[in-house]
């Protein structure tokens, strides 16, 4: 009887480790994709992506990363106490990949309750809900007014101090860093999982 109980507990523990856990609006799942952003100066930011929260957004981000889309791009908009934004191919905040995806957030009819807390990754967009393409931002500090209005899809697991450093760099009147904050190389580890191309608008 003791052996069967031990086996059952071990099995239950294995199942538990595969399930998403929720704590104060934070999510984690074993073997979720991990994105690594290597800055030009050698600094590293690592973030876990949440396909269970924003599946098409994650597919889109992974697709762009695998194509080398973000390599050499900059964080063109930096606001201390708020967020750092990058992913524009022309570095102005006006560019994108040539397509858009559906906004996976509550105000657009999609159940996504990931909060915009420190370190969370989310998709930038225009006033139109389905206008996100490649631009994303990383939260420097909590911004609850964004909750439900933007497609949050991941969170920094290593290098939040680098995010903080970028967020406090000197900027001009348009929130553009005076010294370019360049993403030298962006890679992703999907741990053997194949992610399809995203659905596009």
Where are the language model's segments positioned?
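Cyclophilin-like peptidyl-prolyl cis-trans isomerases
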Residues: 14, 20-201
């Amino acid at each position: 009887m003791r052996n069967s109980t031990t086996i059952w507990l071990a099995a239950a523990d294995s199942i538990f480790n595969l399930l998403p856990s929720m704590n104060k609006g934070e999510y984690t799942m074993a073997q979720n994709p991990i994105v690594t952003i290597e800055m030009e100066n050698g600094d590293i930011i690592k973030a876990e992506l949440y396909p269970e929260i924003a599946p098409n957004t994650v597919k889109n981000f992974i697709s762009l990363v695998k194509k080398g889309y973000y390599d050499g791009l900059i964080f063109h908009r930096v606001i201390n106490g708020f967020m750092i934004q990058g992913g524009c191919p022309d570095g102005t905040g006006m560019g994108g990949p040539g397509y858009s995806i559906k906004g996976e957030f509550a105000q657009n009819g999609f159940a996504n309750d990931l909060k915009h807390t420190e370190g969370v990754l989310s998709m930038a967009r225009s006033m139109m809900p389905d206008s996100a393409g490649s631009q994303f931002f990383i939260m420097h500090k909590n911004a609850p007014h964004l909750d439900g209005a933007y497609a949050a899809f991941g969170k920094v697991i290593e290098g939040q101090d680098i995010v903080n450093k970028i967020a406090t760099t000197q900027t001009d009147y348009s929130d553009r860093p005076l010294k370019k904050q360049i993403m030298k190389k962006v890679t992703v580890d999907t741990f053997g999982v194949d992610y399809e191309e995203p659905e596009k608008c």
